[in-house]
Amino acid sequence: DKLDAFLSDNEEKTLLYFADTTQPVLPRLEAFLEKWGIAVEPSSVIETDNRKIINSNPYFSTTQIENTELTDTMTDISIPLTMPFARPLDTVFETNMDISTSVLLQSSETTSVIPYESESDLENWTPEEYGPFSLAILSKKSFEDGKTSQIVAYGSSVSLSDSLLSSGSFSNADYYLSVFNTLTHRENVIAIQSKTLGGQELGLNTAQVFLIGLSFMIAVP
């Protein structure tokens, strides 16, 4: 398996996975993720508390940071983070031989799940299970020399949309830049200056700065 080979060559590799509620069943990929302790559930996360819903859309709500391991270079953690139209994730195990998992992001306690492949009418839908549900999971494989390879799985591909990355109302761009800075061990980190502070502008919008960080990460093993 090419993904196994990529992550098992003892060179500190990282794989990022973003789930989507419109994607087809991917049995081989999902089986691979489960070997790393990550399960992708066939449902969508939906918020039941109107106070936490964004733009009157129950699939669009705020997200809680559960683990700060990848958020060290965020400039402002008070700005809300969102994982819209997300599939819930689950940890298959916490530790299995040389692989360990940890939850990075969670939905609120008032979220529920609805099968994403159904034509269910929300007006007739009744929640059967409540959160929090995992929305991001980090899985690490440790080698004898102390190096690690890792998978970071996210339940929402929409969280990377241009509108969210360029929005000053959400910290998605700040969060993902911190993730990439941390995973690539950057000493001179890329950061997004808060819009509430003065200072000289660089002539790049948030999405463009994010793409610089993304390109750098892809180029580094």
Task: Show the residue positions of the predicted features.
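Noncatalytic linker/hinge segments flanking ATPase motor cores
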Residues: 55-63, 191-201, 221
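Selective detector of the "anchor" transmembrane alpha-helix that sits immediately C-terminal
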Residues: 8, 209-221
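Short, aromatic-rich amphipathic segments at membrane interfaces
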Residues: 159, 164-166, 190-214
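Acidic, S/T/G-rich, low-cysteine, solvent-exposed domains in lumenal/extracellular/periplasmic regions
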Residues: 1-188
